[in-house]
Amino acid sequence: MTRRERVAEVTVGGGFVAAAALVAAMVPFDHPVEVVPVLLALAALAVASRVRFPVHEGFTVPIVLVFVPVLFLIPLPLVAPVTALALMLGGLPDVVRGRIPPSRLLFAAANSWFAIGPIVVLAFAGATDAQTTPVIVLFAALGAQFATDLGASAVRERIIRGATLREQIDDVVWVYAVDAALAPIGLLAALINPDPHYSILLLLPLLGLLRLFAT
């Protein structure tokens, strides 16, 4: 890891930790904390983070597919830390196989900024389940996801390689197009099944299919 990378990760990753802590302190727990849903969310997000497929000149992961129902599966204050931990778990196999150094797992915090925006929007709107959340709020949550992710990425890339915001937008527009296409599928799974546990399980075969076509 270069000096610029260390500065970027401390800045962006540290900012995420601060934001997640602020959310946890200010956003009320809309339902009780249960171990099984938290573990299910953790596992689903970790599995999704392992699925990579090419998009334009880069790649993306379909994590938004399960992230949407996770927003309604566990209390909102837990979504950000669970997301960051899941990304770390998703990177463990690569560490074990020697593909990446253990220090790369610390990138998980900076890569989890996309979770902050939707949490804030849903908490502000008082949303507790997919069925009763207004469509405009859902669109706002998706937009907030893109905004916080782009903001964090822009800061990171500015520090590392001096990239402009315009260059960042050009790089991620295809990634966000994929996210925009997958998010409604995750929402549909949450809408048609009143039990969010099964909503996530229903999406696992699709993740497997995406993984198959990505190889």
List each language-model region with its residue ranges:
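Short helix-perturbing small/polar motifs within transmembrane alpha-helices
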Residues: 1-59, 65-170, 174-179, 183-212
